Curated annotation (Swiss-Prot):
Primary subcellular site in the record, as a coarse category: cytoplasm
A Pfam family that the UniProt record links to this protein: QueF
Biological-process GO terms, alphabetical: queuosine biosynthetic process; tRNA modification
Native species: Methylorubrum populi (strain ATCC BAA-705 / NCIMB 13946 / BJ001) (Methylobacterium populi)
Protein name, per record: NADPH-dependent 7-cyano-7-deazaguanine reductase
Taxon lineage: Bacteria, Pseudomonadati, Pseudomonadota, Alphaproteobacteria, Hyphomicrobiales
Metabolic or biological pathway: tRNA modification; tRNA-queuosine biosynthesis
Length: 153
């Protein structure tokens, strides 16, 4: 199996924030349990991007679940990739689905889903969900744990 250092180019180094998601480098590392079906979850409670029309900030909680195959996403590179969206203008759907697709292309997981729970803009919350296919029956798949937006009261 390859060493982690072969694949994790940013780990253990001072790494500047990428200027854009397109410029961000996502790293993957070998999965030491590739023979086992299990779920890995990343919860991102303070995701930000910009409205592509007004330039105003948008906020979301992202929940990324995946059943890895040969590869795991290296978490520092994921953090830097997601942080690069804070000055990136895109609609909620584009951010959410684009992140899911980029991770799926990189990792080639057995299964992946992303839930984007966006705070209201113009009085309307937008929740966006994307997945690669049917979830595996052999894996415990907990609820994403983000309640629907109810406003105040």
């Amino acid at each position: 199996m390859d060493s982690i250092e072969t694949h994790a180019k940013q780990l253990g180094r001072q790494t500047p924030l990428p200027a854009s998601p397109e410029e961000a480098q996502l790293d993957r590392v070998p999965n030491p349990h590739a023979d086992t079906d299990y779920l890995a979850r990343f919860t991102v409670p303070e995701f930000t991007s910009l409205c592509p029309v007004t330039g105003q900030p948008d906020f979301a909680t992202l929940v990324i679940d995946y059943v890895p195959d040969r590869w795991l996403v290296e978490s520092k590179s994921l953090k830097l990739y997601l942080a690069a969206f804070r000055n990136h203008g895109a609609f909620h759907e584009d951010c959410t689905v684009g992140i899911g697709r980029r991770l799926a292309d990189l990792l080639e997981p057995r299964w992946l889903r992303i839930g984007g729970y966006w705070y209201p803009r113009g009085g309307i919350p937008i929740d966006v969900f994307w997945q690669t296919g049917e979830p595996l029956k052999s894996v415990w798949l907990p609820d994403q744990g983000v309640a629907p937006y109810r406003g105040r009261g």
